[in-house]
Amino acid sequence: LYKDESTRFGLGSFKALGGAYAVATLAKEYQKEGKDSANLTVATATDGNHGRSVSWGAKLAGCKSKIFIHANVSQERERAMSVLGADVVRINGNYEASLAACKEAAELNNWPIVSDTSWKGYRETPMQIMAGYSVMSREIIEQMGSSRPSHTILPIGVGGLAAGIVAPMWEDMNANLGKMISVESHFSQCFLNSISNGKPTLVDIKEETLMAGLSCGEVSEIAWEILKPTLSHCMSIADEGIAKIMQLFANGDFGETSIEAGECSASGLAALLIAKNNPSIWRQLELNKDSKVLLIGTEGATDPILYKQLIGS
């Protein structure tokens, strides 16, 4: 089973459900106070997709957006935010460095932050964003009818997507939730390390992954509270094989039609294939020929140039 988010609102990823919704909520509150939303500036840090959602939401709400990106965000993802009217600021360093710069600038200029990660004292907006993400779970439950997945593989950066999916599924299925499996990059496995240590554990990212949306070294506080008791297993994967899986999706090898699967979308199938070829992991995950595995296709070709390079066309 594959939940395809490649066409969501024309923005190419699930992020369209969260950031834009949070911006709309902020703008509405601003207007209730008798203020002109044209004078509102929202700020965020991003690897690309979340910033695009915030930029789009700001454009729709008639406000401004200030987007902080790190050194390894592609030029194409930067351009996608700029054409929506965002003022994009590139910071040296990784995602955590861009988030620190965003926090500093927001405090100095009194800008509300629209972040999909949470920290001490900052929870309301990330909860709104996760509420937006929960639409995916409602759609999954509705489309599956009486059937339910035995395993769900969740790509994880800071954990907002995974938490937004798991919470409604837990409400619906409770004890029949099935196995919830996180997949991260080897370079930024903050959830795997945090679960292993029993507490949130920061990863100092030394090398960037091809799966840009997974390049986050610190778990979201709210996501941690939801995922710590609900994740059954954590996996981390290398970049090798991601391009090949994207090619297979594009060629229609996993169904009747071609699927536009971005780098992060390939991570779930990569994890499943690793398990399939490793009897020990297969047994640990309690997989068998009757398993019904749900993969989350988080994005399409959000960087069209890179996508074409990776699929070879």
Regions found by a protein language model. Give the residues of each.
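PLP-dependent amino-acid enzyme catalytic core
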Residues: 1-313
